[in-house]
Structures are given as C-alpha cells and as structure tokens.
Amino acid sequence: MKTQRLGLVVWMVTGRLALAQAPAPVDRDLLAKIRSEAMDRSDVAPVFDMLTVTIGPRLTASPAHKRAAEWVRDRLASYGLENSHLEPWHFGRGWTLEKLTVEMIEPRYLPLIGYADGWSASTSGEIVATPVFIGGKSPQDIAALSTQLKGAIAMTDPIMTNFVRKDRPQPSEPEYVPLSAAYATGIGQPRPNTPAPAQRMAQALREAGAGVILKPSRGEHGTVFVTGRDLGPGAVPSITLSAEQYNMIAQMLQHNIPVKMRVNVQTRFYDSDGGNAYNVIAELPGTDPGVRDETVMIGGHLDSWHTGVG
C-alpha cells in the first residue's frame, strides 16, 4: 500500500513539472519572416563594407571615427529606430597618420613592414641615417650617447627571440586554444600601460633629441601588433617594425655591416571637438504594454586601432 501511495505522489509531482515546463507555442510564421529578413534582405554586407572598406580604420576620437559615428546614426534612423543621436564623452586628442616612409636603403633596398604607433608625433621631415642600436641600454647609457642620438633613428629594444611558442594549431585540432583562453595566458595580449623603466627610457630619448624610435612588434606567428598612446608635446616619434626585419637590421649593425635607412612620419592631432569621442545611441521601443518600459541593451565596438579596420 505504501509503495502504491509513493508511486502516486511521484507521478503527481513529475506530471505537474512536465505540465509546468511545457514549451510555449512556436510562431512559425514569425520565425519565417525573421529568416527571410536575414537571408533575403540583409543589410550586413553594405554596412560592413562602408565601415571597414570605405571609412577604414576608426581610431577613437579621429575624424574617421566621427564620420563612422555620423553614418551609423543616420543609418539607424533610416531603419526606423527612434532618437538616433551621438552622445559625446571626453577622450583626449584625436590623431591620424598622414604619411609614413620606413625603408632600408643600404646595403640593399628593402621596404620595411612597419606602422607608426598611435598618437605618434611627426618627424622633422625625412630622416636618412644609420640607425643607432641601443637595445638593452639603460637611461644612463642613453644620456651618455646623447651626441650620437640627436636627430637619430634609435632602435630601442633588444633583439627579439620569442616568435612562436609552438606550431600554431588549427581550430579543428584538439589542442586548439580559443581566443579567450589565449588572452588569459597572455598570448598575443596588448602591452600593459607603459611601465616605469620604459617611461624613463622615453624621457631619456626625448632629452637626447632622438629623431625617431624603432621597436619590434610583440605579435607572435608573424603578426605585427601596434597600439600607442598620447605621450604629450615633445614626444619622440615612434614606429613598430615587424620583429623579423627589426632583428635583421639589429644583427647587421652588431656585425658592423653598414646600414642606412630612410624614415618619415607625418601625423596630425585634433582638438576640434574639445577632446570628445562619440557613442551612437538609438532606440527601438517595445510594443508589449507589460514590458515596454524595460530596457534591453545591445552594443558593440565602433572604433578600431589605426592599423586595422575592425
């Protein structure tokens, strides 16, 4: 008898749970409309092309970023979203690269793979000179070399030795490390904020009057990873080279092989918007009176680094 009662109780509980968890009816007509919009009338490709191909890199607070923000604002309004507008927030000076030349011209000609660091200053015109390799030297050593460094092309980092931790596995392989895990282990991470020794090095080069700084990329597997920051008036212009080419030039200098380079960096800073960057905000009001006052936020990055299109 007890067994029968227990069975009845279990049946009643599981039966109620099954009824409580019954799925809501599926509106297949609505799903078909959503699929049709995505597959037959998608606007993703034109939007993608406008932002990445036509406008291109969108460094925060740059004119290109402002242009992209205005275009997105108008595009969202054309879709019927309400209150589409730009919302300013203070960032600092905007910046764009206007010209970059970085070449080895002796002992043979070679166009080099390099990018001006974000917010780099401009060089005083074109610099044609033998680079000075100071990788591993202290700020005190640099001060002693001030005569050699005045107006010079300064290679500031030691020769790079870490290019690949292991052969890069493909996503289909069991040992593939997803991007999120790679960042957790430090692989390919952006450089942290400039540490004190690097700040002292930059100050020593500024005081020595160096013409331009060359440093190797920290990217692995042949990538060139470039960031940057606004170091204020009087900062020495700076360029990140591919690590392989940086090493090649440094090794030739160490073996007393004459090397000559041609470098020219021309950039422009912008304060026209008072140091503001912009978020793009638009609203899609709900229709259900029970929840229409609630807010669901959907967002994404509009900006990118100056060396990529995002």
What is each PLM-predicted segment?
Residues 2-20:
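Sec-dependent N-terminal signal peptides of Gram-negative exported proteins
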Residues 22-27, 49, 53-182:
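Noncatalytic luminal/extracellular "stalk/propeptide" segments of secretory-pathway proteins
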Residues 25-62, 225-229, 303:
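N-terminal capping segment at the start of a domain
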Residues 28-31, 44-48, 52, 56, ...:
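Extracytoplasmic/secreted envelope proteins and their assembly/folding machinery
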Residues 29-30, 114, 119-144, 228-309:
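Soluble metallo-hydrolase cores and metallopeptidase-like ectodomains found primarily
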Residues 38, 52-59, 72, 76-83, ...:
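Sec/Tat-exported extracytoplasmic proteins
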Residues 47-52, 85-86, 153-157, 211-216, ...:
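Structural recognition of the beta-strand scaffold that forms the well-ordered cores
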Residues 62-63, 143-146, 164-170, 217, ...:
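Short, solvent-exposed loop/turn and secondary-structure capping segments
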